[in-house]
Amino acid sequence: MEESNPAPTSCTSKGKHSKVSDLISHFEGGSVLSSYIDLQKDSTMNLNIPQTLGQPGLTSSPPRKFLPQHSPQKQENDPDQTQGQHGCLANGVVAAQNQMECEDEKETTLSPEMAIQTAAASPDTHVLNGERNETITDSASSIANSHDENASDSSCRTPGTDLGLPSKEGEPGMDAELQERENGVNTMGLDTLDQHHEVKETNEQKLHKIATELLLTERAYVSRLDLLDQVFYCKLLEEANRGSFPAEMVNKIFSNISSINAFHSKFLLPELEKRMQEWETTPRIGDILQKLAPFLKMYGEYVKGFDNAVELVKTMTERVPQFKSVTEEIQKQKICGSLTLQHHMLEPIQRIPRYEMLLKDYLKKLSPDSPDWNDAKKSLEIISTAASHSNSAIRKMENLKKLLEIYEMLGEEEDIVNPSNELIKEGQILKLAARNTSAQERYLFLFNNMLLYCVPRFSLVGSKFTVRTRVGIDGMKIVETHNEEYPHTFQISGKERTLELQASSEQDKEEWIKALQESIDAFHQRHETFRNAIAKENDIPLEVSTAELGKRAPRWIRDNEVTMCMKCKESFNALTRRRHHCRACGHVVCWKCSDYKAQLEYDGGRLNKVCKDCYQIISGFTDSEEKKRRGILEIESAEVSGNSEVCSFLQYMEKSKPWQKIWCVIPKQDPLVLYMYGAPQDVRAQATIPLLGYVVDDMPKSADLPHSFKLTQSKSVHSFAADNEELKQKWLKIILLAVTGETPDGPSEHLATLNNLPGPKKKSEC
């Protein structure tokens, strides 16, 4: 980089020998005083330019006429020449200033008109996409050329050099007067420069800059797409074809990245390149971006599968060494920029919002009368819709990135990396011991569904915390406590543990209580909404029951769908407790619970056998409030089966007992518990298994039951067997999440399976 001004040392030792000779001849040919006056004129003119451009946001270099004639390398290597220079930093660009002093009172300064012309002629430096583009006008050079070249060289001298000029002590007050003049002239120059700069920012030049930025970022984006498509995807597919892992997994990770890459590299980028070459005759980009709209569907498919793709990369990296080896080898290359595969996979998600941002800026600078206005506006409307989906995926990715950081801080012991987990708050806190009330340092991570209570781990490398307790939000209560000895305390009471904590200040305490309470309320609201939706579908409220019951024939529950009375929950047997149907609600009940008769409107008002609940509603007889709230169509197993993560018949064996066929359900509202029923319509579960903490063994031990798996915890052993491998994998997918405290966030597919079955008797899986 060239120096803006020469150092204020003697130019006789720095300039070329020819310049020195000319300068000496110039002074020998006339009086010293007249030469000095000419010198001061040029010096004053040169002085005004850096003074004007020393403002923030403006950068300049002096006219070429005043630049030193020796090489830049010599300037950098010579320590004497750098003395006395002052660099001002303005928007990342250094503008050098060289302050010179003048002594002669007879010296004439620049007129305001010439100062304005000089300031306006200063070059503007703009930073665009990391590159500097400088436009230097010739006005400053023309001003410099109007004076003698030798005088410009001699202006390098400072007062008091060996030319015998008057000393600066001989002219008191001259510096102040000259500075005053310079300030007045430079103020006018600044105003004119700002106006000139403003005019430039509002014309088509700014539109050209936006289009240029679009082109440059598109080039960088295509290179990232090529990295994903031609490097990561191809290398992993080659490894998959060797049999290291299924090629289907690679296709799921990269989705339609090849199609996206082909569109941008073969169509959009060449179109932008061509348009920028023809910008003088066709200054528009809206028509090109409008052609992008039909191809946004490709991004919709990519965004839709992004969460699963990132999760699959994590799983494959942990479980398949060959996959991990290939990805790490590529990530070490310079082209990756020390970023992981997951970071590069985010590039297509981030690109659509980038188009939206550039188009918005483009429309702000574009005149409504422009022929490109309609195309640009229509493009923005279409791209904005796609950008909203991309922004949602970006937020999820940022959340997932934060979860990965916490996962590493916890020593990779707590499997919290799940898109359904959202970090609400984290921070240091003190825990009051129950025995001696001493305060102990702890760290909390609050998520939308749990609280991690951690202890600091003192180690030089690796994890920072150890999880002491995982407290679920479900059932959690917050109590503000008052302790005179320990202020700012509050209590967290959960199913797993109760903690008395001390915040650092009253504000910190209020923030924690607020965050915890909002998380609890949001959790209950989600589950309450879910339960209300189930109640509307499966239960008949009292008012509706009174109006509808007996007026419409019910659907009878099949006998083989229950093993116990749906009212008193007593088991059926062939001799003493047989099955009966209530003609009003269709439930299967025992003889004790069906020993009632009521007139049913749909049967012409004839008396029919009904259950006790239906009799109470039809006849108007009321029982206790508790029985009222139960409802007459409450079917426990059917309720959870119809809204479950997975449900089907499985073979079950506990310890050395024989295998038996049972109906198993993991409900959505309680996804960490496995419910086991005798039949799909039973109102009471035979047993439940809290899955959290169990160890899953999916290796079959028996040739007779090849699709079996086992759950083990301490001395408890539960063995299950599915009818086929597909059903087994569906169960294992949900159970493997549940044993680590995680819940599936995607919609379950069992409802579609149920809808395709001809009748309730064939509820083999869901």
From Swiss-Prot:
Q: Which residues form the PH domain?
A: 422-521, 643-740
Instruction: Kindly list the positions annotated as binding Zn(2+) 1.
Output: C565, C568, C590, C593
Please report the stretch or stretches of sequence annotated as the DH domain.
206-393
Its subcellular locations are: Cytoplasm, Cytoskeleton; Cell projection, Filopodium
Q: In which tissues is it expressed?
A: Detected in thymus, lung, heart, skeletal muscle, small intestine, liver, kidney, spleen and testis. Expressed in all parts of the brain and in the spinal cord at embryonic, postnatal, and adult stages. Levels of expression are lower in postnatal and adult tissues than in embryonic tissues.
- UniProt-listed PROSITE patterns: DH_2, PH_DOMAIN, ZF_FYVE
Q: Name one GO biological process term.
A: microspike assembly
Please give the function described in this protein's UniProt entry.
Activates CDC42, a member of the Ras-like family of Rho- and Rac proteins, by exchanging bound GDP for free GTP. Activates MAPK8. Plays a role in regulating the actin cytoskeleton and cell shape. Promotes the formation of lamellipodia.
* Domain remarks: The part of the protein spanning the actin filament-binding domain together with the DH domain and the first PH domain is necessary and sufficient for microspike formation. Activation of MAPK8 requires the presence of all domains with the exception of the actin filament-binding domain.
Can you name this protein? FYVE, RhoGEF and PH domain-containing protein 4
